[in-house]
Amino acid sequence: MNFAGFDRQQWFLAHRITAVFQVKQASRKANAEDWRARALARAKQATADLTQQGLLLALGFGERAWLPSADWQMYQQTNTAHLIAISGLHIGLAMGLGFMLVRLLQVFFPTRWIHPPLAQYGGLLMAGLYASLAGFSIPTARALLALSLLLAGQLGRRHYSPLQWLSLVVVGLALADPLIVLSSSFWLSAGAVLGLLLWYRYVPLSLLQFNGKPLWGVWRHLFGLLHLQIGLLIFFTPLQCYFFHGLAANGFVANLLAVPFYSFLLVPLVLFAVLSDGALWSWQVADGLAEFISRLLHLLNGSWLNLSIIQSLLLTAVLALFFGLLLCWIYSAKRMPPLLSVKSKGLSLSSQRSLPVNYRRELQWGITSLIVLCLSIAGWQHSQAANWRLMMFDVGQGLAMGLFKENRGLLFDTGGSWANGSMAQTEILPYLQRQGITIEQVILSHDDNDHAGGINAIFEAFPFAQFISPSYKAYTKVATTQRQLCQQGQRWQWLTADFSVLWPPQAVSRAKNADSCVVLVRLGDFQILLTGDADLSAEAAFSHAVPKLDVLQVGHHGSKTASSEQLIKQAQPKTALISSGRFNPWHFPHQTVLDRLSLHQADIYNSGWSGAVQVDFSDKMTVTLARDPLSPWFSSIIGLSAK
């Protein structure tokens, strides 16, 4: 558990995942397939030779297993991933499609058979059918329940304002599924709807007129789409920055092109192909359309911007200010010149526009409060960055330490890696991006995977950082000119911090535990010792040079092969940081080490229990834990018990 990035505990609980295991061997005992599995199998066979099979199956069944990771990343980085994941948008489209089909069929019915609710029931039935194709995943079930609540209210002749309807739906969903509040997709959906309700309340499409008349026909649809996307740009961007830590510069254009294409062409065609078993070459036509829009989005790819917390807050304040100025411009004068005109004819604002006094007060209070709040938090964040900060990341059974000041940083080890990822990608880089930190130096204690596994990911993100290592081992993303050897006696200064290397005496071809780079860091009056996995023999050689310490990074994850009595007695550390994985097979940290540290009155913090540990240095030293008494309740339960 770290201070930024993906919260696995929250995600597991929101998706009802109570255990994680690895299947080593499996065999099929029976073919107990339901109709969805059979439909998916037929669709897989029918689309086997199509270039966009992964996208078509994702749209038809909510299955992204066959979608290439590069395509999924493209949709994420163009702000259009919501078009692939079957959720409220798709279920709403299915309901609208079912409604229109029933209304069309009612043309052929006798008058006595035509009942207004029949089309609504047809829409709900189509929405339920689409949700079942998606396996009634949590987002689809949530959307279906929300539509059912709205339909029940309409049939019960309940008359509420749009905001009241939204409140009732949110409360109804929370009562039906209390854990829904842990789902980020729920808040994204609710936030998007709330933003659009506010947008249409204060800037309705009816404000626009063409040639002095309300918009109608194709003009109304075209400007309606543009109007919708502008509203989402203003209101949804802050939510996106909060949940995804960035945005796509071309996202507005991408959605402006892709949303109507998916809504009116691709999704209905894929639904028809699934339900008709690919009749009328529907799969082939859908593949051609999917190929076209994918190529179009590919041209817009590459504009993703990672934003820090401060940048996100400032952007939110700017958007709030823009919205306020837009409203002032719209409602400040009774008559204004046309926006787009040719010979006094064109697009203009309605002269009948007005903003009620109560709306005006709501806006003034809301916009001002939001701007002040964003600027205050941004100012506080900026002031905190001026102090030295030491971070022990929670990277499981590995080590990754960071030293930061004024948005500049140094890393000591990078955590482990596996076949298609690393702790650097999932835990370290998200934190650095959210804090707006640039890494200038990377010190590698030794070459074991649990310490060096993320080195290539770090240098891919920060290619100009200096690399300091006790070995000559080459790493793919590290240039030879960036390397500096870590050897006993070296000294250097970075910003106002002084670094002294206590071990090893010489570099080796591949550094192991005993060759760990041991660094003493002086931050004014504070002393920090970073030991990596240095063992007892190494400690015996350098411990005499260790001063009294404020912070000790306990060697080898708390193993009894390190942290000797000689070192602990010499250093007398006030704070001891242990990086270990919970329930690791070696049972680190060892009780002998814990007892030794306690005997010398050190405050002990283990990342396996406390999550990431943050130490701030100002006039005094302050320790903050990612998992503390103020953390959400599930952070203290999920994954913390061996039973």
Describe the role of every protein-language-model region.
Residues 424-425, 445, 449, 453-458, ...:
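Active-site-proximal loop/helix segments of hydrolase catalytic cores
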Residues 89-110, 147-153, 193-203, 269-273, ...:
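Membrane-interfacial alpha-helical segments at the cytosolic side of multi-pass membrane proteins
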Residues 268-271, 385-430, 434-435, 512-532:
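Conserved beta-strand hairpin/beta-sheet module of binuclear metal-dependent hydrolase folds
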Residues 14-146, 152, 391, 492, ...:
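Aromatic-rich juxtamembrane segments at the membrane interface
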Residues 408-447, 534-548, 631-643:
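Pre-active-site segment of Zn-dependent metallo-hydrolases
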Residues 443, 447-487, 573:
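Active-site HxH/HxHxD metal-binding segment of metal-dependent hydrolases
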Residues 1-82, 347, 422, 426-430, ...:
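Membrane-interface helix/helix-cap signal primarily in integral membrane proteins
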Residues 104-114, 118, 194-391, 404, ...:
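Transmembrane helix-bundle segments that form internal channels/tunnels in multi-pass membrane proteins
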